[in-house]
UniProtKB/Swiss-Prot annotation:
Residues 725-755 are annotated as: Type E(+) motif. The keyword Cytoplasm does not apply. This is Pentatricopeptide repeat-containing protein At5g16860. The keyword Repeat applies.
């Protein structure tokens, strides 16, 4: 069979072809233009065969064959021909074309192989060869190969060429060798705009934004080089990371005047810069005026709204992308998931993640971090475990977050398990990391997990481990804030002061605002409201949390007037008053017996402050009225609530019924609580105590039997006291302490002394059906009394004894402490589950409102 090749005839119309027979006996007239008409590999090969069979393959035709093989993508045949081609300028052009073609196809290693082959065959590269080779070295981050090519460029003299120098700077940058990139740049004899772009990009991408802007300043001010659109794309990200929006605005103006603003990449960088500077209105203006947008444009807007807390706008934009069927990438989905998660909408974040998976987009490390944050926010443990399993099943590095930061995914897993109250699982993951693998975030999330959801003592133990010599990580501001939460929980004033001192020593500037807020909260909850006020007064900047924290502290300590003074000052300065602030005001009034003021603030909430009262506000007002004995008014308030009263309101009412011994009203409140939350342990305990105080022991037995039947467990009461050597905890009748004998003897002696001056045991608080003598013995062994005796034994003369109880202080113990403060040389500061009691010289700061 005769095989013919059809090649388009340039001289004829486009549909006419020249026929070339494979077995023709006469030599065809094959010219360079004829060869270049070949469009397929088979056509070029057939021409090649004809030239070989007739022996007419000249160097000129070989050169054109090589060029055509490259153009049709048959690079291997081009290399074969070039190996036998004698060195020449035309041949160097072909080597360059081959190296570039392999580079364009992502075959960097093949580029370097060809470069080595070229050199071994005694070919001399030119100023076009080196940029292609340097680009290949950069793509595979091979500094060694790059240095070899660099040396050859020095030998051949091409290093002085500006294009070669620019490519060399870019290569060292891609290999993360900034010092070499800067050295090459400084040694260049001439710089063009590409040179400046290369060095600015190097600093910008390798985490040196400040130096990048300094180089840009030199480029424009010192050397007068006019920026192009690539310059803007390289300079705007450093502006974003440093928050230098003033320079960003200048670049924006330059982009407008130089007509670069229509460049999509410049527009994207401007949107990103404004978004990261929190200037979303400006970002939206640029975004809206962009004639061409891609997914990067939308991503910058969605991420920007999420970062500044405008989650509704972020979600709205994400939904608009879905409506307009814009193809979203993993960055878009991750930003949307983050927006939902940071709003506390964890289940919505999980829903978006499912949509992402169903659309065929695989999550990356950033996505997992956002989803796990959403799970943590709503306590979705099972979903969190599913994400954990996904991360293990698919090739996702738990120790990377996609931006080079170590441990971000595993840190988020630890945080998720801790916030879902699986602190042991979180600790197991923490322990699975070697000491060298743990970064400061790892320590912080574990300490935070113990502080808020586990064991505050273990949180402080972990903090202590961070200060050991072999630990390479030191606490940062976030670690300190988590540790202060633990101190506040334990009322560990001594340790809190040590942490405060560490923060002052190790902060380069002022203590961060959020740490100062935690210090105010810690000192207030540790019973030192004067130290809390001192921190407040020394703060350079304050926010709503600062003022509210101090106001809460005053309320806890019964200083209602001072709390309202803080509130009035907040109003004068112009802070926005929200529901939380007004709740603290009502709380302070309740714990100070300020009934009229509390009622006035409650009645003015909506009309003056624009805040609708919620269930918590009603509960606080019920507590205010109930503590004052106005139980009928409190009940009317509950019945007139515009919403269904939740358990918290009825519990407040029941607590007041117990204080005033109103059994029937207490039973009514308990019934309401049972209807709404049948396993609420506090309501059963309050009702049982109410019956006990009324001497209705059969009802006490019935309630306790009901609690056992429903599996409701009463928390055991315990008290702890802070001493020189640490914190010591006592339970009722506790005799496990090594110095129990001395503790009981001190207590016995002091109880006898206060009886001599008028103290009479209030046996109604002994919640057991026994005779009065046994009740006296039961009251004697209460945990807060044992803690006080230990404090008397161990506290230096004149220093305050600080006691914390996990439940409400017993009425008899409160009376006993009042008498004790008359006969001992110590102030007694007692914190119970409700408030602080400062006992001094026979009186208590609560004034009976507890």
């Amino acid at each position: 069979m005769i095989r013919r090749l059809l090649i388009p005839n340039a001289a004829a119309k486009s549909h006419q072809y020249i026929k070339v027979s494979l077995f023709s006996t006469s030599a065809p007239e094959i010219t360079p233009p004829f060869i270049h008409k070949c469009k397929t590999i088979s056509q070029v090969k057939l021409i090649h065969q004809k030239l070989l069979s007739f022996g007419i393959l000249t160097l000129n035709l070989t050169s054109h064959l090589i060029s055509t093989y490259i153009s049709v993508g048959c690079l291997s045949h081009a290399v074969s021909l070039l190996r036998r081609f004698p060195p020449s300028d035309a041949g160097v052009y072909h080597w360059n074309s081959l190296i570039r073609s392999y580079g364009d196809n992502g075959c960097a290693n093949k580029c370097l192989y060809l470069f080595g082959l070229m050199h071994s065959l005694s070919w001399t590269p030119d100023n076009y060869t080196f940029p292609f080779v340097f680009k290949a070295c950069g793509e595979i981050s091979s500094v060694r190969c790059g240095e070899s090519a660099h040396a050859l460029s020095l030998v051949t003299g091409f290093i002085s060429n500006v294009f070669v120098g620019n490519a060399l700077v870019a290569m060292y940058s891609r290999c993360r060798s900034l010092s070499d990139a800067r050295k090459v740049f400084d040694e260049m004899s001439v710089w063009d705009v590409v040179s400046w772009n290369s060095i600015i990009e190097s600093y910008a991408k390798l985490g040196k934004p400040k130096v990048a802007l300094e180089m840009f300043s030199r480029m424009t001010n010192e050397f007068g080089c006019r920026p192009d659109n690539i310059t803007l794309v390289n300079v705007l990200p450093p502006c974003a990371s440093l928050g230098t929006h003033s320079l960003g605005k200048q670049l924006h103006c330059f982009a407008v005047t130089s007509e670069m603003i229509q460049n999509m990449f410049v527009g994207n960088c401007l949107v990103d810069m404004y978004a990261k500077c929190g200037m979303m209105d400006e970002a939206n203006t640029v975004f809206s005026n962009m004639s061409v947008k891609d997914v990067v444009s939308w991503n910058a807007m969605v991420a920007g709204y999420s970062q500044i807390g405008r989650f509704e706008d972020a979600v709205r934009l994400f939904e608009k992308m879905q409506e307009e069927k814009i193809k979203m990438d993993v960055v878009t989905w991750s930003a949307a998931i983050s927006g939902y998660a940071q709003r506390g909408l964890g289940y919505e974040a999980l829903g978006v993640c499912r949509q992402m998976l169903s659309s065929g987009i695989k999550p990356n490390e950033v996505t997992l971090i956002s989803v796990l944050s959403g799970c943590a926010s709503v306590g979705a443990l099972m979903h969190g475990k599913e994400i954990h399993c996904y991360a293990i099943k698919y090739p996702i590095d738990l120790r990377k977050n996609g931006h080079g930061d170590e441990n971000m995914v595993i840190n988020q897993l630890i945080d998720m398990y801790a916030k879902c109250k699986k602190v042991d699982t979180a600790r197991a993951m923490f322990d699975s990391l070697s000491p060298k693998e743990r970064d400061v975030v790892t320590w912080t999330v574990m300490i935070g997990g113990y502080s808020q959801h586990g064991d505050a003592n273990k949180a402080l133990e972990l903090l202590s481990e961070m200060f050991e010599e072999d630990c390479q990580t030191r606490p940062n501001a976030f670690t300190i804030s988590c540790a202060l939460v633990a101190c506040a929980s334990l009322a560990a004033l001594r340790i809190g002061k040590q942490i405060h001192a560490y923060a002052l020593r190790n902060q380069q500037n002022a203590v961060p605002l959020f740490v100062s807020n935690c210090l105010i909260d810690m000192y207030a909850k540790c019973g030192s409201i004067s130290d809390a006020r001192l921190v407040f007064d020394n703060m350079m900047a304050k926010n709503e949390v600062t003022w509210t924290s101090l106001m809460t502290g005053y309320g806890m300590h019964g200083y209602g007037e001072e709390a309202l003074g803080i509130f009035d000052e907040m109003r004068r300065i112009g802070f926005k008053l929200d529901g939380v602030t007004l709740l603290v005001v009502l709380y302070a009034c309740s714990h100070s017996g300020m009934i009229d003021q509390g009622m006035e603030y409650f009645n003015r909430m909506k009309t003056v402050f624009g805040v609708s009262p919620g269930p918590e506000h009603y509960a606080c007002l019920v507590d205010l009225l109930g503590r004052a004995g106005r139980l009928n008014a409190a009940l009317r308030l509950i019945e007139e609530m515009p919403m269904e009263p939740p358990p918290v309101v009825w519990v407040a009412f029941l607590s007041c019924c117990r204080i005033h011994g109103k059994v029937e009203l207490g039973e009514y409140a308990a019934e309401k609580i049972t209807e709404l939350a049948s396993n609420h342990d506090g309501s059963y305990t309050l009702l049982s105590n109410l019956y006990a105080n009324a001497g209705r022991w059969k009802d006490v037995t019935r309630i306790r039997s009901l609690m056992r039947h429903k599996g409701v467990k009463k928390r055991p009461g315990c008290s702890w006291v802070e001493g020189i050597k640490g914190t010591t905890t006592f339970f009722v009748g506790d005799k496990t302490h090594p110095h129990a004998k001395e503790i009981y003897q001190v207590l016995l002696d002091h109880m006898q002394r206060i009886k001599d001056i008028g103290y009479v045991p209030e046996t109604g608080f002994a919640l057991h059906d026994v005779d009065d003598e046994e009740k006296d013995d039961l009251l004697f062994e209460h945990s807060e009394k044992l803690a006080l005796a230990y404090g008397i034994l161990t506290t230096p003369q004149g220093a305050a004894i600080r006691i914390t109880k996990n439940l409400r202080v017993c009425g008899d113990c409160h009376t006993a402490f009042t008498y004790m403060s008359r006969i001992i040389d110590h102030d007694i500061i007692l914190r119970d589950s409700s408030r602080f009691h400062h006992f001094k010289n026979g009186s208590c700061s609560c004034k009976g409102y507890w």
